[in-house]
Amino acid sequence: MIQDGWLHTGDRFRQDEDGFLYITGRIKDYFKTIQGKFVAPTPIEAQFADNPCVEQQCLVGLGMNKTIMVAVVSETMRDAPRDVIEASVLDTVEQLNGVVEKHARMGGVILTYEPWSIENGVLTPTLKIKRDQISDRFGEEASAMAVESAESKTLISRWR
């Protein structure tokens, strides 16, 4: 639908100095933390995806005081020791926490070996992550981790 000369698609974007538009995420993917601030998970997930230890990731944090990354260990790292994987992803979290806004900082990571798929209900037929499914599966644990991380002022990793 066109309103005020704009086509409303549900996408968020940024415009550079030359007038080019870049899609930065979907409005419906944003969530509000306990501080009442909105987090755009897509750019954070994209940066986290640079870590070779993970192949799928989803940032959760609706109503939490810290965000938590849920990540699937990459097939190439499945035989690596867990402590090596944890050290790598927590290093990535620490680096990202240094550049994201304060309310978007992560308190930790939930790691799993089970890939997300259409068959297990986590991906859509177009291979997009169903964020509500991630929240249903990992939300309670993520909420507890967010509280623990905020209280202890440390990064936490858990396996599932």
Where are these regions (language model features)?
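Active-site metal-binding loops of divalent metal-dependent hydrolases
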Residues: 5, 11-12
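Conserved C-terminal "lid"/linker of ANL adenylate-forming enzymes
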Residues: 56, 95-160
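AMP-binding/adenylate-forming catalytic core of the ANL superfamily
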Residues: 12-104, 115
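Short clusters of hydrophobic/aromatic residues that line enzyme substrate/ligand-binding pockets
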Residues: 1-2, 31
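Conserved ATP-binding loop and adjacent catalytic segment of the adenylate-forming AMP-binding
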Residues: 3-6, 150
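Ser/Thr-glycine-rich phosphate-binding loops at phosphate-binding pockets of nucleotides
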Residues: 9, 33-34, 124-126
